[in-house]
């Protein structure tokens, strides 16, 4: 965002959320997670940063400026893991390593608004990983494949 880079750095026992100035290699600030957490996707919503954990079935909400932990939230029961996270201007959109994208209430991310299953003309894609929302589409990479999907979030087709 602007000249600031936010990074969700995952590794059990070493996970953290970091903030960098563009072009710099040292973080200006960071917040470490508990040792049992493997952090995954993150996204910015207003003055907050939302972050998922891989298998802990919870996410974190931070103050964007200080990266101070504001709160935690449990995943909706249908989400198995936390992989990627983005924001479409209304809802958080999360992936869990399956073919599904979960639309979560930004004011209460433990509540699922809806979910979609992603498919192309001839193939169903699973292991949806990192997510980005841009110009009305969700972009998702497929884990360990050189594929980036362009997904219509209203009619979950691939372009």
Predicted regions and their residues:
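Conserved beta-strand positions in repeat-built beta-propeller and related beta-rich domains
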Residues: 1-12, 49-56, 92-98, 140-144
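Histidine/lysine/aspartate-rich catalytic loop segments that bind and position anionic ligands
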Residues: 94-129
